[in-house]
Amino acid sequence: MAVELVHPEVNLNVTRQVDGPLIRKLSVSNFRNYSKVSLEPSQQMVVLLGNNGAGKTNLLEAISMLSPGRGLRRAQLTQLNRAKIDTTDEDNIIEAQRQWAVSVKVESNGFQTTIGTGCETTAADGKSAKRLVKINGEIVKSQ
């Protein structure tokens, strides 16, 4: 697949081949500053723009949680839960009580796969948690 990069300030047109897997849909809930967001990029290349603190790195961290390990910031699972809660909105209070989750629909060689991960609290105090991983809706056991 070819991607055309256009930079308006430099009048630069570049065509590049994209051979790797493409994220067709990203869904995030209760992750850092996001209560719920779903993105479906229409292009094969995406640039995230925004002010400091807008959540650009949080989206990248959410994607990084789909690989083995603790993500790009190496945070504890319980630290990834949404931090700010609007206590005037009952739906937000209920949603904030749930743990974080990240899901992507990935396309590679014409095939689509859904990969998801999230956190499940394992103690009443909410401080202990385990990570769950699903591929195409099936829970994957750790190796």
Please give the residue ranges for each predicted region.
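Pre-Walker A-like glycine/lysine-rich segment at the N-terminus of P-loop NTPase domains
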Residues: A2-M65, D86
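Nucleotide-state sensing region of NTPase/ATPase domains
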Residues: P68-Q143
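Intrinsically disordered, low-complexity segments used for protein-protein interactions
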Residues: M1, L5-P8, G116-T117, E138
